[in-house]
Regions:
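Enriched for short, Lys/Arg-rich terminal
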Residues: 12-17, 24, 56, 61-98
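Alpha-helical interaction segments
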Residues: 4, 28, 49-51, 60-62, ...
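Generic structural signal for secondary-structure transition and capping sites
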Residues: 23, 35-39, 90
Length: 98
């Protein structure tokens, strides 16, 4: 089963502001969500975590030590919707994650 990756306007703007190398790294990591968007502890498949933010279930993906993507998974539509991508420090400040 393959999921479509959809980026919000904010996520697209963040990507557009990155240098070419950083944008490539972020895109490569987001593409991995096409096959497996859910966290799989111990699998070595990236730093993903299920979160509850403002009563909504969403997921977090650390990309390197620089960026964090927040996304929701819609199984019935086979979609991963990337809600936001932010600098990792901003993610920690805003959401209080370690």
């Amino acid at each position: 089963m393959s999921f479509d990756i959809l980026l919000s306007q904010n996520a697209r703007e963040y990507l557009g502001a990155l240098d070419e190398k950083s944008a490539r790294i972020v895109k490569d990591n987001l593409r991995k969500l096409e096959e497996e968007p859910y966290p799989r502890p111990g699998s070595g498949s990236g730093d993903r975590e299920k979160l509850h933010v403002d009563g909504e279930e969403m997921y977090r993906l650390h990309i390197g030590r620089t960026h964090t993507a927040f996304y929701v998974v819609l199984d019935e539509d086979q979609q991963v919707r990337v809600v936001e991508i932010v600098d990792i420090d901003e993610a920690h400040k805003r959401y209080g994650f370690d």
